[in-house]
Amino acid sequence: MQFSSAVVLSAVAGSALAAYSNSTVTDIQTTVVTITSCEENKCHETEVTTGVTTVTEVDTTYTTYCPLSTTEAPAPSTATDVSTTVVTITSCEEDKCHETAVTTGVTTVTEGTTIYTTYCPLPSTEAPGPAPSTAEESKPAESSPVPTTAAESSPAKTTAAESSPAQETTPKTVAAESSSAETTAPAVSTAEAGAAANAVPVAAGLLALAALF
């Protein structure tokens, strides 16, 4: 009798435990929960999408919020196809401030239903460098001096030719044969020698004239 009563008690306890056991719902739905966070006397609300789990115990229903069973929280993602925007950066130094417009990329990070926008440099866009200039474009044209002939650079020959008609053919012949300044020196010397030869009879004539007086 005692054995049978023990069996009945264990059966009743087992049925009671079965009636009060927690059940896990696998087909859960989603809902939006507002979370309020406070820091340094400042509070802000954030909406988070989460799952709803219902636990039934007799006629009382408890609802708890938990993450989705197979859905992980989305990690911050960086978009590869970024667009560009212009951001104004203000720099101050020695009580002087100036603004600079900088073109930068826009990356959108989505977490739940909140969208955070951060500014970051463009991934791999570089400004094209200036094209190298050729030597012909940057170097000025060099002017070469025009060679001058002996007849143009030595006017002394013409003077010698005009002053001494007897020696007129000699300087012209030398000027026609040579076009360099080195060969013109003898022509000038020849003209001077001719002038000196003419000066001897003139001096002799002056002495003879002086002897008459």
From Swiss-Prot:
Polar residues biased stretches: 145-172
Induction context: Induced during cell well regeneration, by fluconazole, and in high iron conditions. Expression is also induced by TBF1 and repressed by SSK1, and CYR1 or RAS1.
Compartments where located: Secreted, Cell wall; Membrane
Keyword Signal: yes
UniProt note: phenotype after gene disruption: Leads to an altered cell wall structure with a less electron dense inner layer of the cell wall, and a disorganized outer layer.
Keyword Membrane: yes
Classification via InterPro entries: Flocculin_t3_rpt
Name of the protein this chain belongs to: Cell wall protein PGA62
Organism of this sequence: Candida albicans (strain SC5314 / ATCC MYA-2876) (Yeast)
Lineage: Eukaryota, Fungi, Dikarya, Ascomycota, Saccharomycotina
